[in-house]
Amino acid sequence: MINSNIRLYILGFLAFFASLIQNIYTPIIPRLYDDFQVPLFWINATVGGFIFIVAVMQIVLGRSIDSRDSKKVLLTGLGIVIISSFICAVTHNFILFAISRLFQAIGCGIIPLVTLTLLAKLSTDNGRAQAMANYQIFLSCAPALAPILGSTLGARWDYIGIFSFLLVISIVLFLIIFFY
């Protein structure tokens, strides 16, 4: 059985990871232009499309997430991220890359909703404020760290390295959630 503090940190890391997924590949957008040989407009459209889908997921699932099995929904979201990260890492076809990236946004949109629900369920009235504060800390670190991590991985291994990294982390998180 996992200690409740460890669970809270896992949930915080899930929030961090969801935000990381959104922001990690922006530093290599010019390289994607070279790799895929498509107009920069279409590469930028994957960024805007990703954000739009995450927002839609929040609206669509936001009202009903409390009535669903949180663990199954979270595993579904992580499963979508795993599959889409794998496809993004191995494809050399931009259309497949873009579609997979947009599916990745569906999984990414699920994660923070379930995380907040579980944080509320796992924390007591007295600890809820601290749990939410820690959640916000994790959440706000990702936009600062994602471009650094993305440019480091991208400089060495291009987009393949970035999406392979996301694949490995999402598999680890899936296994942790599955077994806890």
Per-region residue spans from a language model:
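Extracytoplasmic
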Residues: 7, 13-33, 38-40, 58
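Small-residue-rich transmembrane alpha-helices and their cytosolic helix-loop interfaces
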Residues: 15, 47, 51, 132-140
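Residue-level signature of mid-helix packing/kink "hotspots" within the transmembrane helices
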Residues: 23, 51-59, 143-144
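Conserved MFS/SLC helix-loop-helix module at the cytosolic interface between two early adjacent transmembrane helices
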Residues: 56-92
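Paired small-residue
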Residues: 84, 95-103
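Cytoplasmic helix-loop-helix junction between adjacent transmembrane helices
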Residues: 100-138
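Helix-loop-helix hairpin linking two adjacent transmembrane segments in secondary transporters
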Residues: 134-178
